[in-house]
Amino acid sequence: GITEHLDYLKELGIDVIWLSPVYQSPNDDNGYDISDYRAIMKEFGTMDDFDRMLQEAHKRGIKIVMDLVVNHTSDEHAWFVESRKSKDNPYRDYYIWKEGKDGKEPNNWGSNFGGSAWQYDEATDMYYLHCFSKKQPDLNWENEKVREEVYDMMTWWCEKGIDGFRMDVINMISKDQSFPDGPVDDGLYGNHQPFVCDGPRVHEYLKEMNQKVLQKYDIMTVGEALNTKIDHAMQYAGEDTNELNMVFHFEHVSLG
């Protein structure tokens, strides 16, 4: 495992390791479908193994950065298991549920993985939003309880002594609450990205995250900002924005 190779990594001059998701997951999307944020995927070991790796890495001057996936969870996460049971349970609004429209999906949004971004659920005769796999329901960041759950989980990891977070598609956590149809560029489905990327409250949420968690620890943060232009990227990581330290985005791949 990683721990046994730390000396080799140090000899190479590596001083930071970024771990892709190692949390408990059904592994529908390479671990980006998390079913328990406070457990390690069995294929990788145990939490005791993680703690030992972190300790040994720090002994060698190597920092550990965790992947943070909080736009969505696995459909096997305890929150979603409860959320889908009824329309009035305490976890219902942890996710984005909508009534169908004329016997079809709530709008024409397509998933990043193909097909509709809405999955019908027979238990309550409603649809839930998943911008990625149908096994990755999007969290409802409009719900303050969801945000507090996320901040509590982040604090838990910071207290362990990790050195940073790489935040997966973090600019997608705020959705346009009118959920309008998207432009149909090709195919059958509309593009959801104009209504979920750089949404109306995303900077509010990140400032709140910074105030409640990040500023309390000596950690590095880098956010993945899907479909963000360079001028907007600077709003996430400006010197005085109190949000993230860095972002990476993909505008450059379309140059030339």
Where are these regions (language model features)?
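Acidic/aromatic-lined carbohydrate-recognition and catalytic surfaces
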Residues: G1-T155, E159, M172-K229
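Conserved protein kinase catalytic-loop anchor
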Residues: I162
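Hydrophobic residues within beta-strands of alpha/beta enzymes
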Residues: I17, F165-M167
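Noncatalytic carbohydrate-binding groove/subsite architecture in carbohydrate-active enzymes
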Residues: A225-G256
